[in-house]
């Protein structure tokens, strides 16, 4: 097989972009799914709506044969008409509940379709052990295979760059048009995702996932999980609704016996006609209407939609949640563990000043700093070289004979071993002090003065040395992102504690923490400290959220109740987390807490509204059953007739479900209030509103209906 330097462009898929949801098509599919969900095996999953489903079947049967459960006391044709109307309204009640769930599911499936569009059946060039290339289909690739990708070709699978540097277009996944530079040697920049496109140069990639197990495949399976497992709070609420439904079912089931008892008393006191009128008011269809009106059908019909919509709102932030449990956990978070760099401050710290110590000059510091940064390709390292060049410093070193020393979290320094045997280093001040002492050197007193000066300015001090002598301190300027103080204050009002982790010294960390407005901070933190902080918070009964992108973050991401991994991060980090941010913006963790709380607030608000509705429906239907028993005074709405009261209450009960679908999908407007303030506000708006709204609506429907 030939080994061309430029491989032929043989993908069978053109560049894809995430499409906008086709709302018309979404609603058409949702209407179709509403009928599919009428299947008993699907309907039984929602106990509240299943009662309505069974009630619809029963009222349909008594429409066909009004005497099915006993002789009808009223006019049989009028009874058949009433039964038919009740059946129709109950049918649409179930259909509207199915539609709400189908719309929420459809939005998730639309996202899955957009992710599927990034997958393409591509040709891969596999690098054989002898160095030659073999053309195979991407589905034949296996974990550990090495492939070659060139400019304009689609990357056929998830992998790690082991050779080459190139720009990759990840817009099909992230929506971000700016290309991302990929190169070997770092956790972040070496990770590539199948379905993205290489824009320039060539890359040698080692495949890290078998077909069907890549990042996109896993995300699709998660997003398509319409049959998702319910969250603990959702299960608890479902159980509560089921218990309420059973209570009302027992009450309504015993009502015929109670009515017969009263009818016998009325027959003796007022005659048989009054007794028969009372019995007619307790027909099977009317009792089912009372049951449907009393059970919490509104929240029962919207509960699944609220949960699915919560995941969809997260997806609109370009974040993939592995489960509804993760989204819900965001709302219960008590502590946020945040990295300083990239989350609280902008990621790229820039060299701003060289501060000489130990009688050296600024030029001396610039020269040593530049030598220590010759192999440092980070933005910080490049900014040090750029600042040194302002002093006309030339690095007269043969790079082929010099040796770069990479930064590590353990040593907390990097540098260069020069051809003449000298060692130049830059790094955290205490790390450089340790390096000097290990070589028998001494620490000049003005190092601490420079250290404190930079720290008090909120910058990061890096010491530079050659062998056993410190030459000076580099001032790396760090800028806190705007608006964070206000957002942290909002979180504080909601009872969420913010903890900043940084490798900076205590003074610098204190200045940054005060400027950003975080509640607590850990200075000179190592990656291992993250998991210790999380465990400490969890031992106090708190739920913890954190972000991470590197392999060393994976244990902490797995330990956290909510772990948000960056899409630009390593495969290990993404597998350990329960959320992945496609935009790789760690600040989004704050937004996710808001979304989680909004989900819980929406569920609670609509539950309150649904249960409060029962009061008005109670006063609409109950007087129609016991009117002959002399409790017509309970008809406080002045409804025209028994038939009008029943139909009005059921129409309202059905229409309120589609009316609340937008609120269920978009969520209740979030306000950063304390738990007590939120409770009082929701009881006032959705509790009191849930009582008043049906009184008004049922009366208006009664006025419009032609019953007399």
UniProtKB/Swiss-Prot annotation:
<keyword id="KW-0630">Potassium</keyword>
<feature type="transmembrane region" description="Helical">
    <location>
        <begin position="49"/>
        <end position="69"/>
    </location>
</feature>
<feature type="binding site">
    <location>
        <position position="553"/>
    </location>
    <ligand>
        <name>Mg(2+)</name>
    </ligand>
</feature>
<keyword id="KW-0460">Magnesium</keyword>
<keyword id="KW-1133">Transmembrane helix</keyword>
<feature type="transmembrane region" description="Helical">
    <location>
        <begin position="235"/>
        <end position="255"/>
    </location>
</feature>
<dbReference type="GO" id="GO:0008556">
    <property type="term" value="F:P-type potassium transmembrane transporter activity"/>
</dbReference>
<keyword id="KW-0812">Transmembrane</keyword>
<dbReference type="Pfam" id="PF00702">
    <property type="entry name" value="Hydrolase"/>
</dbReference>
<keyword id="KW-0633">Potassium transport</keyword>
<dbReference type="InterPro" id="IPR008250">
    <property type="entry name" value="ATPase_P-typ_transduc_dom_A_sf"/>
</dbReference>
<dbReference type="GO" id="GO:0005524">
    <property type="term" value="F:ATP binding"/>
</dbReference>
<feature type="transmembrane region" description="Helical">
    <location>
        <begin position="283"/>
        <end position="303"/>
    </location>
</feature>
<dbReference type="InterPro" id="IPR023298">
    <property type="entry name" value="ATPase_P-typ_TM_dom_sf"/>
</dbReference>
<keyword id="KW-0067">ATP-binding</keyword>
<feature type="binding site">
    <location>
        <position position="549"/>
    </location>
    <ligand>
        <name>Mg(2+)</name>
    </ligand>
</feature>
<keyword id="KW-1003">Cell membrane</keyword>
<feature type="transmembrane region" description="Helical">
    <location>
        <begin position="683"/>
        <end position="703"/>
    </location>
</feature>
<dbReference type="Pfam" id="PF00122">
    <property type="entry name" value="E1-E2_ATPase"/>
</dbReference>
<keyword id="KW-0597">Phosphoprotein</keyword>
<feature type="binding site">
    <location>
        <position position="426"/>
    </location>
    <ligand>
        <name>ATP</name>
    </ligand>
</feature>
<keyword id="KW-0479">Metal-binding</keyword>
<keyword id="KW-0472">Membrane</keyword>
<feature type="transmembrane region" description="Helical">
    <location>
        <begin position="619"/>
        <end position="639"/>
    </location>
</feature>
<keyword id="KW-0997">Cell inner membrane</keyword>
<keyword id="KW-0547">Nucleotide-binding</keyword>
<dbReference type="InterPro" id="IPR006391">
    <property type="entry name" value="P-type_ATPase_bsu_IA"/>
</dbReference>
<comment type="subunit">
    <text>The system is composed of three essential subunits: KdpA, KdpB and KdpC.</text>
</comment>
<dbReference type="GO" id="GO:0016887">
    <property type="term" value="F:ATP hydrolysis activity"/>
</dbReference>
<feature type="compositionally biased region" description="Basic and acidic residues">
    <location>
        <begin position="7"/>
        <end position="23"/>
    </location>
</feature>
<feature type="active site" description="4-aspartylphosphate intermediate">
    <location>
        <position position="339"/>
    </location>
</feature>
<protein>
    <recommendedName>
        <fullName>Potassium-transporting ATPase ATP-binding subunit 2</fullName>
        <ecNumber>7.2.2.6</ecNumber>
    </recommendedName>
</protein>
<dbReference type="GO" id="GO:0005886">
    <property type="term" value="C:plasma membrane"/>
</dbReference>
<feature type="transmembrane region" description="Helical">
    <location>
        <begin position="645"/>
        <end position="665"/>
    </location>
</feature>
<feature type="binding site">
    <location>
        <position position="376"/>
    </location>
    <ligand>
        <name>ATP</name>
    </ligand>
</feature>
<keyword id="KW-0813">Transport</keyword>
<dbReference type="InterPro" id="IPR023214">
    <property type="entry name" value="HAD_sf"/>
</dbReference>
<dbReference type="InterPro" id="IPR023299">
    <property type="entry name" value="ATPase_P-typ_cyto_dom_N"/>
</dbReference>
<feature type="region of interest" description="Disordered">
    <location>
        <begin position="1"/>
        <end position="23"/>
    </location>
</feature>
<dbReference type="InterPro" id="IPR018303">
    <property type="entry name" value="ATPase_P-typ_P_site"/>
</dbReference>
<comment type="similarity">
    <text>Belongs to the cation transport ATPase (P-type) (TC 3.A.3) family. Type IA subfamily.</text>
</comment>
<keyword id="KW-1278">Translocase</keyword>
């Amino acid at each position: 097989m030939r080994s061309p330097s430029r491989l032929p462009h043989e993908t069978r898929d053109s560049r894809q972009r995430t499409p906008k949801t086709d709302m018309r098509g979404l609603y058409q599919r949702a209407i179709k799914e509403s009928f599919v969900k009428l299947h008993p095996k699907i309907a039984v999953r929602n106990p509240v709506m299943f009662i309505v489903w069974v009630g619809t079947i029963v009222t349909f049967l008594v429409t066909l044969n009004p005497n099915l459960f006993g002789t009808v006391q009223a006019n049989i044709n009028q009874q058949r008409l009433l039964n038919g109307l009740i059946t129709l309204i109950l049918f649409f009640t179930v259909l509207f509940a199915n539609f709400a769930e189908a719309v929420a599911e459809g939005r998730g499936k639309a996202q899955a379709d957009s992710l599927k569009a990034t997958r393409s059946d591509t040709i891969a060039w596999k690098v054989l052990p002898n160095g030659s290339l073999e053309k195979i289909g991407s589905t034949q690739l296996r974990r550990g295979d090495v492939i070659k990708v060139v400019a304009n070709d689609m990357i056929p699978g998830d992998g790690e760059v082991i050779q080459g540097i190139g720009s990759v277009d990840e817009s099909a996944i992230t929506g971000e048009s700016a290309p991302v530079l990929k190169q070997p040697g770092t956790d972040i920049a070496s990770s590539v995702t199948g379905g993205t496109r290489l824009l320039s140069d060539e890359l040698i990639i080692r495949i890290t996932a078998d077909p069907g197990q890549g990042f996109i495949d896993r995300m699709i399976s998660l997003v398509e999980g319409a049959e998702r497992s319910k969250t603990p709070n959702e299960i608890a609420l479902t159980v509560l609704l089921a218990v309420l439904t059973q209570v009302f079912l027992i009450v309504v089931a015993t009502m015929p016996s109670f009515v017969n008892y009263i009818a016998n008393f009325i027959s003796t006191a007022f005659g048989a006609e009054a007794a028969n009128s009372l019995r007619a008011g307790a027909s099977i269809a009317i009792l089912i209407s009372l049951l449907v009106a009393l059970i919490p059908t509104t929240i029962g019909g919207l509960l699944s939609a609220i949960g699915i919509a919560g995941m969809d709102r997260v997806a609109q932030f370009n974040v993939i949640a592995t489960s509804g449990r993760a989204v819900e956990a965001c709302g219960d978070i008590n502590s946020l563990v945040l990295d300083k760099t990239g989350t609280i401050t902008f990621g790229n710290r820039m060299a701003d000043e060289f501060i000489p110590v130990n009688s050296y000059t600024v030029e001396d510091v610039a020269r040593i700093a530049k030598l220590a940064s010759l192999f440092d390709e980070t933005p910080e390292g490049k900014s040090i070289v750029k600042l040194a060049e302002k002093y006309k410093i030339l690095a007269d070193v043969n790079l082929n004979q010099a040796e770069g020393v990479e930064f590590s979290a353990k040593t907390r320094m990097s540098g260069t071993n020069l051809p003449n045997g000298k060692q130049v280093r830059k790094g955290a001040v205490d790390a450089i002090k340790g390096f000097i002492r290990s070589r028998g050197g001494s620490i000049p007193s003005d190092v601490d003065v420079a250290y404190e000066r930079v720290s008090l300015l909120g910058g990061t001090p890096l010491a530079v040395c050659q062998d056993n002598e410190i030459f000076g301190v580099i001032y790396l300027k760090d800028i806190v992102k705007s608006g964070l103080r206000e957002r942290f204050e909002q979180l504080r009002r909601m009872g969420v504690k913010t903890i900043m982790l940084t490798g900076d010294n205590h003074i610098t960390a204190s200045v940054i923490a005060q400027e950003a407005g975080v509640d607590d901070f850990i200075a000179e933190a190592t990656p291992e400290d993250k998991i210790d902080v999380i465990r400490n918070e969890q031992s106090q009964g708190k739920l913890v959220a954190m972000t991470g992108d590197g392999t060393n973050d994976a244990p902490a991401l797995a330990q956290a109740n909510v772990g948000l991994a960056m899409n630009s991060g390593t495969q290990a980090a993404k597998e350990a987390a329960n959320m992945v941010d496609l935009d790789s913006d760690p600040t989004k963790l704050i937004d996710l807490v808001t979304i989680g709380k909004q989900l819980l607030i929406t569920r609670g608000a609509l539950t309150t509204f649904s249960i409060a509705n029962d009061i008005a429906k109670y006063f609409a239907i109950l007087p129609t059953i016991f009117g002959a028993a002399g409790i017509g005074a309970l008809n406080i709405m002045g409804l025209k007739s028994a038939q009008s009261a029943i139909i009005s209450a059921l129409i309202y009960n059905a229409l309120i479900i589609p009316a609340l679908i937008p609120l269920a999908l978009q969520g209740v407007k979030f306000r950063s209030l304390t738990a007590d303030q939120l409770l009082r506000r929701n009881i006032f708006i959705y509790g009191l509103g849930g009582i008043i709204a049906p009184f008004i609506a049922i009366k208006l429907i009664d006025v419009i209906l032609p019953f007399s």
